[in-house]
């Protein structure tokens, strides 16, 4: 993200669901001159343009055609250099019938002084290489998430009182290659903290983790 913002580059981040893409991107988006857009399957071209307008703070109510609104977005980025536009869940913008929404993003990048990061599940990379060569060959930066390491889990739980057995279970939930991911770790921790609050306790034990697990669909 930092490289794309600094050098006005185009980057892609891919990773499986639950590996922490959205969490990390939202954290970065707290920095100045960063606009974060989260996409979904129902978005039309006009919805994408409106989301970008809202993300960069353009006044509402201008209306106009998609072309004219995209031009205003380009003008904004050319006037306000140093911005990064993050498009999360970008794989949801592509289907077998149309790639128009990705072409809108390509047009903004080509004609604006702005860095763009698109992020999504692994099929995003496949779709770009197979069906959107004009987008793929513009990529300056690429990063593929590999999941959390043991040390990263320990760092994430820093500040909490966790016994050895509970720590081992939390590490497994985050790093297990079959079902482990950041989302499972985060959900487990949130439930653990709820239980601790109810009990008036502070120490995370294996018993508490088991109670938290009973509240979840695993």
Model regions: which residues?
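Walker A/P-loop nucleotide-binding motif
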Residues: 5-27, 40-41
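Loop/turn-to-beta-strand initiation segments
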Residues: 9, 80-85, 111-119
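C-terminal alpha-helical "lid" subdomain
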Residues: 20-24, 147, 151-218
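Short glycine-rich substrate-engagement loop in P-loop NTPases that contacts/grips substrate
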Residues: 40-80
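Conserved P-loop NTPase "ATPase switch" module shared by AAA+ and STAND
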Residues: 75-101
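A short beta-strand-to-loop transition that corresponds to the Sensor-1 phosphate-sensing loop
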Residues: 89, 118-123
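Short regulatory helix/loop adjacent to the ATP-binding pocket of P-loop NTPases
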Residues: 124-139
């Amino acid at each position: 993200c930092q490289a794309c913002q600094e050098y006005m580059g185009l980057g892609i981040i891919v990773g499986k669901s639950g590996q922490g893409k959205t969490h990390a991107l939202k954290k970065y988006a707290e920095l100045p001159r960063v606009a974060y857009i989260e996409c979904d399957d129902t978005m039309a071209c006009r919805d994408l343009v409106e989301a970008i307008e809202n993300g960069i703070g353009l006044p509402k109510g201008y209306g106009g055609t998609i072309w004219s609104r995209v031009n205003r977005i380009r003008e904004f980025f050319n006037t306000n250099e140093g911005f990064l536009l993050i498009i999360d869940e970008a794989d949801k913008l592509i289907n077998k019938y149309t790639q128009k929404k990705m072409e809108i993003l390509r047009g903004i990048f080509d004609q604006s002084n702005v860095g763009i990061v698109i992020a999504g599940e692994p099929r995003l990379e496949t779709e770009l290489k197979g069906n959107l060569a004009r987008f793929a060959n513009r990529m300056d930066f690429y990063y593929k998430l590999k999941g959390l390491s043991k040390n990263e889990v320990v760092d994430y739980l820093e500040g909490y009182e966790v016994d050895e057995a509970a720590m081992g279970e939390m590490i497994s939930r985050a790093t297990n290659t079959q079902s482990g991911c950041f989302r499972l770790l985060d959900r487990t921790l949130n439930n653990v903290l709820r239980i601790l609050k109810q009990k008036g306790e502070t120490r995370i034990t294996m018993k508490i983790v088991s109670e938290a697990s009973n509240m979840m669909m695993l």
